[in-house]
């Protein structure tokens, strides 16, 4: 497991906290494995009625760890099975998910919220998915879920053009439920999760399932995306794009993206 994923039970709520602040919560393979286990364990436990995802101040997640990307792009290792092992349970969980975003939500740090039932964000939240900029394709079922949520054009701007969405734009697009101050974020997330947990659990799970696409449809799209993602990751185009990104990123004063 990973020391960068903190799991806590608060009553009937399971809190999954990304805790790698020195890397802006860039997600490693071990972190994916820890989150996958938490989701599966929580779903199997009748005492858990809701999941919560939180990051650290200033970063929900800056996306996948770029060192893992580089290793895969140069053929040193495979990349993808750990992500799939997390994304499929994320799509198939029967229990509601509430999330809180403060600061960066990049790549999978954005697409994870398409699987959440309520997402709270602070005014400084920034959602961005630079997949195509890195020679890659959308993941986490976002190519299916985003157009359904916000329409083709906004989804295209987010997923294909890599445009950043502020908290306000994300709320307008339907990614964010409510914008709250930084100091109130975790309390509001927990309040919502506890409200969910207080409802009759079977009725809640059925109601949630009725409002969502069948899990097998989402899982099928995630698998299709992953196939293209893996193929793209070892392409010359992606290798050059990732190396160019790392070159820019390592320059003094260079922004994250």
Q: Which sequence ranges carry the predicted segments?
A:
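C-terminal alpha-helix plus adjacent terminal tail
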Residues: 1-11, 45, 60, 162-168, ...
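Hydrophobic alpha-helical membrane-association signature
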Residues: 31-34, 82, 185, 225
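Crotonase-fold acyl-CoA enzyme core
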Residues: 6, 91-204, 235, 240-243
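Conserved CoA-thioester-binding segment of acyl-CoA-metabolizing enzymes
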Residues: 1-56, 88
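Terminal peptide-recognition signature
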Residues: 16, 20, 35, 53, ...
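Glycine- (often His-adjacent) and acidic-residue-rich active-site loop
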Residues: 40, 47, 54-92, 105, ...
